[in-house]
Amino acid sequence: MKKLILFFIPFICIGQLKFLPKSKGEYVEHTYYSLSYIEDHEQAEWVHYKLNSEMLNGKKVRKRYYIIDKKVSTGSANYFDYTNSGYDRGHLVPAADMKMDSISVIEASYMSNISPQNRNFNGQEWRKLEEHVRFLAKKNEIYVTTGGVLSYGLDSIGTKNKVSVPNLFYKIIYNVKMEKMTAYLMPNKKLESFKNYKVTVDLIEKLTGIDFYHQLEDEMEERLESML
């Protein structure tokens, strides 16, 4: 049994390493997703993971707790940084995408996977976008990259840790089989339909300074990242 576990976990991690963005922060690898943590903002600049229909068939239910991510060398934000802030503890990797097993449920609860989100944003159009991502993943395997646009001068919450409040959040979806890349850039507030916020990956790269999908051949990267 021990040999089986040791074989299975690395198999999952290898899949996660495909198409990682270039990291400006501390790179942290979990079993089902990877992230780049920016200490100055006490959150991830991006999270990146694979999603497909088999993974969405999991039956594990989200546990409503939040855990400090001990893999972050400087220490992640904690639960109390968000208390009475007026902001939701918004998941970057949605808990609904992480129902495969007990490990995935725990990893979705790490505070390194959390960012301050307006309640009307998190519970409405952002949630609908997350549901749309799952709809796409049931058809074809996809890669998803998500984060807040982090910059100096943002408002912050928390007393022990100063957690920046992004004004914008992005989500990039890459369908390898269909050779299609879709991106959304959404203000952190109550919105109309998420479909109105489709942008190019090029624009998100310009705003964040992050190089996404740099592993692709130049011609393909330029073509996919300019898609609208």
What are these regions (language model features)?
Residues M1-K18:
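Bacterial Sec-dependent N-terminal signal peptides
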Residues I14, K24, N57, T146-G147, ...:
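Feature targets compositionally biased, intrinsically disordered low-complexity regions
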Residues K24, V28-E29, D218-E222:
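Functionally engaged cysteine thiol sites
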